[in-house]
């Protein structure tokens, strides 16, 4: 159903009239494994950049942006409208940012709640919008950010910091960029990873690889098509119960040891036809063991996990899969942090896990406490360690 709808959108795009030479018009499609999770189309003229972004997770959300340009191509005003078409728990949002010299004013209306701010900005600041499944590459490409990178970055390890303006809030933050080659540029992802961008000879983005980020998405450039019309169709699927839903739902797994409850909370990512070990979950790197916040185990009585005694309380669980097929379970004294905030100085123990294989790929990541074993399973792997009351 999804692939048929997406194919029809691309075919329609190919039959549309091309824009005049003075304009730029294109689109980006973003995928998470087998699922298409975001679309963007944009048009640029000498005085204006206008685009639409549709995000499908957890439900269809349509974002419309407009940038007004001065004669030198700099942005004087940005407008962003966020409309939740198939995500009823998300508030609508209208944001206007006025840029004058070295300052900006932002007017944010979130479901009727107004907030106005004013702040200084750095020279050359550019608007950005991150959807949760990739950046707005139409904004970056249209505004020539990457043409500027080609001019100012030498190949190798040279980086440049460009001040950016979050179109959804008006806040500013520096973004780091690293040029790997004439056609490869890395964009900083919250200072924890890089998004790898492939450019053409003119400096336009043709693809973006977010596999090293927490989003794990791939984006590629395609012909312009009608994103708002596509959003209506996907919103109808949401209402019919046929949407994608949450990317990684939070799960509370309950087990019992000699009548005492043990609880594990974790985010459960989906396989989505991807190879997990070595790609989604890299070898040789500590993994949050799930998604979203750090995975946590809680018990009101002392436990023996493997051969290690843990006092009653809460602990975060991490894993370290290795190229040779072995896996270590890491128990950490911190808990409540996000899954990217691992701090090895709080580790209590690293212990080997028993490694097994499932007969067929498992779609949902899962953690369970059954028959005296704490098991972690996904795709074709299952890792286990003994667990008991002290």
Residue ranges of model-derived segments:
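Short, exposed beta-strand-loop hairpins at the edges of beta-sheets
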Residues: 205-212, 373-379
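Pro/Ala/Gly-rich low-complexity, hydrophilic intrinsically disordered segments
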Residues: 216-252
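Predominantly extracellular/luminal regions of secreted and cell-surface proteins
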Residues: 250-273
């Amino acid at each position: 159903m999804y692939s048929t709808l997406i194919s029809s959108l691309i075919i329609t795009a190919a039959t549309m009239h091309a824009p005049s030479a003075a304009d730029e018009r294109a689109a980006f499609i973003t995928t998470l494994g087998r699922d298409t999770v975001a679309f963007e189309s944009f048009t640029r003229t000498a005085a204006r950049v206008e685009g639409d972004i549709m995000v499908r997770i957890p439900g269809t959300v349509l974002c419309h942006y407009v940038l007004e340009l001065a004669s030198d191509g700099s942005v004087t005003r940005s407008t962003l409208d966020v409309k939740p078409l198939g995500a009823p728990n998300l508030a609508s949002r209208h944001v206007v940012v006025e840029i004058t010299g070295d300052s900006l004013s932002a007017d944010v209306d979130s479901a009727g709640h107004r907030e106005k701010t004013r702040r200084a900005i750095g020279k050359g600041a550019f608007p950005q919008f991150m959807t949760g499944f990739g950046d707005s590459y139409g904004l970056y490409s249209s505004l020539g950010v990457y043409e500027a990178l080609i001019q100012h970055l030498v190949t190798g390890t040279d980086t440049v910091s460009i001040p950016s303006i979050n179109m959804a809030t008006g806040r500013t933050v520096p973004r780091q960029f690293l040029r790997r080659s004439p056609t490869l540029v890395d964009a900083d992802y919250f200072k924890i990873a890089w998004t790898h961008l492939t450019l053409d000879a003119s400096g336009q983005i043709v693809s973006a690889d977010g596999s090293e980020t927490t989003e794990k998405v791939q984006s590629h450039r395609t012909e312009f098509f009608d994103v708002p019309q596509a959003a209506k169709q996907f919103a109808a699927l949401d209402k019919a119960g046929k949407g994608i839903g949450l990317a990684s739902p939070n799960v509370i797994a309950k087990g019992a040891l000699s009548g005492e409850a043990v609880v594990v909370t974790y985010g459960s990512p989906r396989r989505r036809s991807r190879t997990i070990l070595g790609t989604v979950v890299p070898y040789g790197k500590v993994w949050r063991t799930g998604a979203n916040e750090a995975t946590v185990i809680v018990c009101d009585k002392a436990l023996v996990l493997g051969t290690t005694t843990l006092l009653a309380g809460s602990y975060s669980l991490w894993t370290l899969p290795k190229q040779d097929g072995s896996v270590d379970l890491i128990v950490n004294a911190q808990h409540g942090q996000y899954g990217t905030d691992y701090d090895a100085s709080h580790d209590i123990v690293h212990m080997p896990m028993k490694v097994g294989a499932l007969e067929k790929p498992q779609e949902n990541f899962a953690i369970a406490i059954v028959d005296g074993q704490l098991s972690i399973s996904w795709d074709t792997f299952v890792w286990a360690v003994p667990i008991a009351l002290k």
